[in-house]
Every structure is written in structure tokens, then in C-alpha cells.
């Protein structure tokens, strides 16, 4: 038996060191497909209680020793650092290095870390394994390596470009989000990272995803820059039927903003990682859905065929909109998903979850296909995710976009010039754009508006905004039943020419 094992290892080594050998997503897909045909094995924690039961402040004390960054002794611009297990990051992930001739496991060692005041026995953690990893790159200065990618927890990953700070997250896959049965969170259980050459400007990462009802193989090509772009290829296999599959999911946070002001006095006018869902539908329509922090779970679906793009955006970059020196929400990126090929019929879905503070991610957006194959059959999805602070460049230049949405008590100016509340809710929506700024200010811009059965549009007016060189829509709305949601839409036109994206707003219930 020992001889056979040695022979098998020798054969594998020969394959890995063959000059014709090259690692690819197909190698990961074979494992994913094999896993899909077997019963799910839940990951087992090997974490000592001192790490499992620690508080966040203690976990923060465990820091990677920067002098021991992986590839530190190579000329490659990319470096790797690793996350230690602790708290709810209590199961190890395997991390491998891929070279031109071989795959090599990157082994855990406590010597990679400094532990602060955390008391531990080195012998009990010597084979612990990592919780995840981060990628460093000289994105802001050629003399300094900054973190640009973090892969930690379930299938979450965060990415930033030049001058950005971490905000929203992307995920590999979402299953049954917002369904009564409860959400299932797939996890990346193993990674393979290609060793980059000194001249490489991109980093390739492969990942094996596992979950009770799905497996998957992923290839991520990270291209850092002013906008960091991640090219994603995924091969997904169902173990069992799911209620809903979320492809290219994005996760963010919205606590309050001018469309839904803070119920308590707060020096910060806005507090969010993203303030809207942008969609470029298959028929060419652009849609903007401002985000809410509802009192009850809210799910919005936008049905279409072959989406051209969608993303959770942070529109409005002035520091004065946030006034937060610690968390710098003005520097947090937007994330824009651009599908490759035809994704067929389905929906872009937005999930908004009530939250009382900014520590909870309460916003999710993803693509969900109408039809799913039988378990075991392969699904392929290719797309890019662009992490950017230049939201106007994510939009068509000839189509105006919503710069801000503000909610106010509706009022009417009396003959004595005093404004008197009239029982309505007023929405102030500013539209701007490169082509719109070229229009003469006397252009007869009007609004096409509509509202659902639970509301009535009392008045809508459009006027030129000389500050933004765009147009401002003011719409006064009367809600029939405040216990129900109210849907409304608006777009700017000039005669039969559509000038703007569609503002699609949902006023939450009980507001």
C-alpha cells in the first residue's frame, strides 16, 4: 500500500513538473464537479478556544508581520499576507502557490504573525492553517505596498483601486437570499495563486467553492489601477435544487442619506457604503434605484433578458456629504458588474434589510437566472467587476444620471411667501451628465412620471439647475396607506427624446 501511494505521488509530481503542464480553471472545475456528486462535508474547526472565543479587539491584535510577506524576496510587485483564524473565522482554508512547473502548498506558521497580548501555545497552533489572505501592490506609490484585495470569510472578497478605502464586498455566490428558508453561504475552501513575474500587472487567483447545495470553480484576474478591475470566470454545479441562485452578488451598507434622513441628530449627513443600485438593462434602459434602510425586509426584482450591467454605486464624492474623518465613506468604491456573453432571462434583484447601525451589511444585489439546470450540470458565468470612484464613467455619456435624491415635507408657497405644508412628501431629484450640460438652459425639458396604486402625484416640476448645469425634478406625492410601500418612476425627456436614466424609487412602508 505504501509503495502504491509513493508511486501515485511520483506520477503527480511528474505531471506537475512536465514542461507542458499549466494550471487552469479546469483543474479546479474537476474538483468542484466531483464534490457536487458527493454528500456535503461541513468544514471542521481546529481552532483552540482562546482564539475561537476572543473578542474583536483581541483578534485585531493578531497582525501579520509585514517583513515576512510572501514573495517579499522576489521582484514581483504583488505580495501576499495572510489572515489568522479567530472569532467566527474559525475554519482553515488551503492556500497554494502556482508556478510555471508546480503547485506548492503555502503552509501556516505562527512565525508569520505577532500576537500582541494574546496568550497561546505555539505547539497547539503550529498546524492551524490560515483564515484567508490579502494582496498588496504599490497602487498609490511605487515605494509603498498597499492592500488591494482581501479574501476572508465565506465567499466574500473586497477590492480597491488607487485612492480608495475598503467599503462594499463582492461574493462568489449567493443562495436563497431573503427566502423564508434562510440564506445559505457558500465558502471558498481552497485557493491557488499564480506567482506573478516581475513585469506582471495582473494577478490570477483560482478558488474552489463549496456549500451544502452547490460547488464551483472560480478564476479571478485582478488588474489594479485607478479603477481596479477583476475579471471573473465561474463554473457552478448544483448538488441539490435551490430556491434562488445569486450570481455576481454584491454586499453593501446603507444606514441613512438625504432620501431617508437619520431619525436622530447626527453630524454626518449621510452614512453608507453605497447609495443606489444602477442597472443597464438588456433593452438599453438605464435604471437608478436609491437605497433604503427599511423597517421591514424589502426585495425588489427587475426582470430582463441579457443584462448589460449592474452595480451598487456611491454617487456623490464631496466630503461634505459624509463629514466622517475616521471611516471616509467619500473614498469607498462603487462596484460595477459587466456580464460577458448572454446570461439569458432573469432578474437583477435588490435586497434591503433593516439595520440599526453601520456595522451590519444590509444591502445585497445580484443576478438571478429564471431557469436553473438539474443538479450536476455545469453553469458558466463570465463577468468583470470594476471598483471605481468615477461613477460618471460607469454610465453612458449621452444619458443623464441621478446625482442626488432628497426627501422633504411637501409644501406650497402662500401669497405671503410663507411655505405651508400640504400633507405631501416632496422628492427633489437632480439629474446631470456630460451631454445634458451642453443643452441650452431654455431647453424644454419635461418629466415622464408614474406612481403605483398606493400614491398620487400631486405636482411635478422641472427646472434648470445652474449649479450642476443639469435639471432638477421636484415631485410632490400623496401616499394613500402609509403601512404599504409606494413605487414611483421618473425620467427626463425633450419632446420624444429620452434624456436621462429612469429614477425608480420605493418609499418604504411606515415612513
Curated annotation (Swiss-Prot):
PANTHER family: GLUCANS BIOSYNTHESIS PROTEIN, GLUCANS BIOSYNTHESIS PROTEIN G
Function field: Involved in the biosynthesis of osmoregulated periplasmic glucans (OPGs).
The keyword Signal is annotated on this UniProt entry: yes
Any one of the GO CC terms: outer membrane-bounded periplasmic space
Gene: mdoG
Primary location class: periplasm
Similarity remark: Belongs to the OpgD/OpgG family.
Pathway(s) this gene product operates in, as recorded in its UniProt entry: Glycan metabolism; osmoregulated periplasmic glucan (OPG) biosynthesis
Localization terms from the record: Periplasm
UniProt KW Signal keyword: yes
GO biological process: beta-glucan biosynthetic process
Listed InterPro entries: Gal_mutarotase_sf_dom, GH-type_carb-bd, Glucan_biosyn_MdoG/MdoD, Glucan_biosyn_MdoG_C, Ig-like_fold, Ig_E-set, MdoG_OpgG
HAMAP family: MdoG_OpgG
Gene Ontology MF annotations: carbohydrate binding; catalytic activity
Species of provenance: Shigella flexneri
Alphabetic keyword roster: Periplasm, Signal
Name assigned to this protein: Glucans biosynthesis protein G
Pfam families in UniProt: MdoG
Signal peptide (from-to): 1-22
Amino acid at each position: 500500500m505504501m509503495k502504491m501511494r509513493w508511486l501515485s505521488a511520483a506520477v503527480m509530481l511528474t505531471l506537475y513538473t512536465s514542461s507542458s503542464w499549466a494550471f487552469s480553471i479546469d483543474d479546479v472545475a474537476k474538483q468542484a464537479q466531483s464534490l457536487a456528486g458527493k454528500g456535503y462535508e461541513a468544514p471542521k474547526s481546529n481552532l483552540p478556544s482562546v482564539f475561537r472565543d476572543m473578542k474583536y479587539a483581541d483578534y485585531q491584535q493578531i497582525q501579520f508581520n509585514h517583513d515576512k510577506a510572501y514573495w517579499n524576496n522576489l521582484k514581483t510587485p504583488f505580495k501576499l499576507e495572510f489572515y489568522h483564524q479567530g472569532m467566527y473565522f474559525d475554519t482553515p482554508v488551503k492556500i497554494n502557490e502556482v508556478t510555471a512547473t508546480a503547485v506548492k502548498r503555502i503552509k501556516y506558521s505562527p512565525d508569520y504573525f505577532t500576537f500582541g497580548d494574546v496568550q497561546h501555545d505555539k505547539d497547539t497552533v503550529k498546524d492551524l492553517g490560515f483564515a484567508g489572505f490579502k494582496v498588496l501592490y504599490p497602487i498609490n506609490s511605487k515605494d509603498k505596498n498597499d492592500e488591494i484585495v482581501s479574501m476572508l470569510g465565506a465567499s466574500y472578497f473586497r477590492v480597491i483601486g488607487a485612492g480608495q478605502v475598503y467599503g462594499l464586498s463582492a461574493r462568489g455566490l449567493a443562495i436563497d437570499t431573503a427566502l423564508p428558508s434562510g440564506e445559505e453561504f457558500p465558502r471558498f475552501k481552497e485557493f491557488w495563486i499564480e506567482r506573478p513575474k516581475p513585469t506582471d500587472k495582473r494577478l490570477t487567483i483560482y478558488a474552489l467553492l463549496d456549500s451544502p447545495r452547490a460547488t464551483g470553480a472560480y478564476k479571478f484576474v485582478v488588474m489594479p489601477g485607478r479603477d481596479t478591475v477583476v475579471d471573473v470566470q465561474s463554473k457552478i454545479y448544483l448538488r441539490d435544487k435551490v430556491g434562488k441562485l445569486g450570481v455576481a452578488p454584491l454586499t453593501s451598507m446603507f444606514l441613512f442619506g438625504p432620501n431617508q434622513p437619520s431619525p436622530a441628530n447626527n453630524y454626518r449627513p449621510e452614512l453608507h457604503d453605497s447609495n443606489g443600485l444602477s442597472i443597464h438593462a438588456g433593452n438599453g434602459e438605464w435604471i437608478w434605484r436609491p437605497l433604503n434602510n427599511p423597517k421591514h425586509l424589502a426585495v425588489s426584482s427587475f426582470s430582463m433578458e441579457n443584462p448589460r450591467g449592474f452595480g451598487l454605486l456611491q454617487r456623490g464624492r464631496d466630503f461634505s456629504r459624509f463629514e466622517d474623518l475616521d471611516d471616509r465613506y467619500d473614498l469607498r468604491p462603487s462596484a460595477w458588474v459587466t456580464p460577458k456573453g448572454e446570461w439569458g432571462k432573469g432578474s437583477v434583484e435588490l435586497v434591503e434589510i433593516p439595520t440599526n447601525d453601520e456595522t451590519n451589511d444590509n444591502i445585497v444585489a445580484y443576478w438571478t437566472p429564471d431557469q436553473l439546470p438539474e443538479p450536476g450540470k455545469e453553469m458558466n458565468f463570465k463577468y468583470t467587476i470594476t471598483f471605481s470612484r468615477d461613477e460618471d464613467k460607469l454610465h453612458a455619456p449621452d444619458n443623464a444620471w441621478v446625482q442626488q435624491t432628497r426627501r422633504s415635507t411637501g409644501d406650497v408657497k402662500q401669497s405671503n411667501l410663507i411655505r405651508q405644508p400640504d400633507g405631501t412628501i416632496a422628492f427633489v431629484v437632480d439629474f446631470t451628465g456630460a451631454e445634458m450640460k451642453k443643452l441650452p438652459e431654455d431647453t424644454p425639458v419635461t418629466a415622464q412620471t408614474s406612481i403605483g396604486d398606493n400614491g398620487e402625484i400631486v405636482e411635478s416640476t422641472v427646472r434648470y439647475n445652474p449649479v450642476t448645469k443639469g435639471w432638477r425634478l421636484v415631485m410632490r406625492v400623496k401616499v394613500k396607506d402609509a403601512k404599504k410601500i409606494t413605487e414611483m418612476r421618473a425620467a427626463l425627456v425633450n419632446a420624444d427624446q429620452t434624456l436621462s436614466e429612469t429614477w425608480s424609487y420605493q418609499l418604504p412602508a411606515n415612513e
